């Protein structure tokens, strides 16, 4: 099973990806986690990414694509994986398609979680409150200004992926406003 999760920030992609990976015993591939991993292992790509991040810039698509390609080659991905946070653009989706084809693989589904923007803001506030309540570290991008920027970026860059994957017959749209367990039930139904 090879799956991509799409949805705006706060839509529950990470939660649903985690639930799916636990049930099917396949890895969840998060670009943030993959970046941190290659940086900590001090690989060549990791050193490049670290230098870019330390300079305050965004890691280029070519580096992210290389990291994803390398990660998909690892043995735990033989039976599948769930991509969370990648691809973010149509360009990355096209590269992912090439990467998978070169490995004689293809995506089984792209799951898009649809959530009302007001609900997204409420979810972000709740996440901040819950993090503070347990003495955790609040994410630097969990504030109104940063969150609004992330939503704009999602609309401009990531939302066009819906059309890209719909045209390829891969898109499965799920109402992300339902309870977490109900969303999970609907998603699992795609793979029965």
Swiss-Prot record:
One of its GO terms (biological process) is AMP salvage. Keywords: ATP-binding, Cytoplasm, Kinase, Nucleotide biosynthesis, Nucleotide-binding, Transferase. It catalyses: AMP + ATP = 2 ADP. CDD domains: ADK. Coiled coil: none annotated. Residues 126-142 are annotated as: LID. Pfam families: ADK. ATP binds at residues 10-15, 127, 178. Transmembrane segments: none annotated. Monomer. Belongs to the adenylate kinase family. Catalyzes the reversible transfer of the terminal phosphate group between ATP and AMP. Plays an important role in cellular energy homeostasis and in adenine nucleotide metabolism. Consists of three domains, a large central CORE domain and two small peripheral domains, NMPbind and LID, which undergo movements during catalysis. The LID domain closes over the site of phosphoryl transfer upon ATP binding. Assembling and dissambling the active center during each catalytic cycle provides an effective means to prevent ATP hydrolysis. This is Adenylate kinase. It comes from Bartonella quintana (strain Toulouse). The lineage of its organism: Bacteria, Pseudomonadati, Pseudomonadota, Alphaproteobacteria, Hyphomicrobiales. The gene is adk.
């Amino acid at each position: 099973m090879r799956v991509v999760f799409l949805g705006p920030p706060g839509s529950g992609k990470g939660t649903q990806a985690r639930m799916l990976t636990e049930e099917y015993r396949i890895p969840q591939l998060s670009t943030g986690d993959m970046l941190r991993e290659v940086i900590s292992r001090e690989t060549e790509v990791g050193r490049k990414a670290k230098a870019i991040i330390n300079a305050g810039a965004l890691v280029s698509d070519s580096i992210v694509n290389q990291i994803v390609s390398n990660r998909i080659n690892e043995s735990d991905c033989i039976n599948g994986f769930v991509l969370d946070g990648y691809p973010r653009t149509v360009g990355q989706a096209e590269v992912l398609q090439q990467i998978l084809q070169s490995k004689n693989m293809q995506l089984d589904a792209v799951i898009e979680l649809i959530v009302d923007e007001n609900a997204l803001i409420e979810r972000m506030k709740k996440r901040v409150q819950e993090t503070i309540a347990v003495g955790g570290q609040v994410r630097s991008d969990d504030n109104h200004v940063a969150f609004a920027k992330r939503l704009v970026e999602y609309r401009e860059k990531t939302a066009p992926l819906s059309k890209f994957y719909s045209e390829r017959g891969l898109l499965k749209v799920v109402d992300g406003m339902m309870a977490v367990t109900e969303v999970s039930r609907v998603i699992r139904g795609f793979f029965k």
